[in-house]
Amino acid sequence: LRGTEIFMDMFDNPDYLHSLMDYTTRVAERMASFYIDTGVDVLAVVDPVVSQISSRHFSAFLSEPFSLLFAFIRQEGVLSSFFVCGNATKNLDVMCKTVPDGIAVDENIDLAAAKQVIDRYNITVQGNIPLTTRMLLGTQQDNMAYVIDLFDQIEEIDRNLILSPGCD
């Protein structure tokens, strides 16, 4: 709704941004209701801004809206996934505090390190096979080798892990 102006609003117009986030949360809850009514099992909430802001700004402007949205989805009996593009490593901890059922991360996040953070909250981490360079342009063997290497880096692969493409 604001494009890149949202970044300036965090500094110049925080009250307006809070009211905008309240509005968009209500819209997101209504949209979630439509999806839930169709019978979805998991509802992904996608945010392109998280990787571009500080944890302080996330806490100030996004924590409450996301927490409310994930609580609403859970109350409706559906699982939620917090899907972020870009390197949101610095915000993984504050994202977990919004209590989604899963967090889907992009290919430029160290999945093994991310899983260590996210596991502290007993949240599932999802990601992050490179979609273009590995899956589209690579061979089947490239993909298999990538996954084996990734599994070798992750301490606990049998809990709270969904292997999938990143956001590309």
What are these regions (language model features)?
Residues L1-D168:
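Active-site loop segments of alpha/beta catalytic cores
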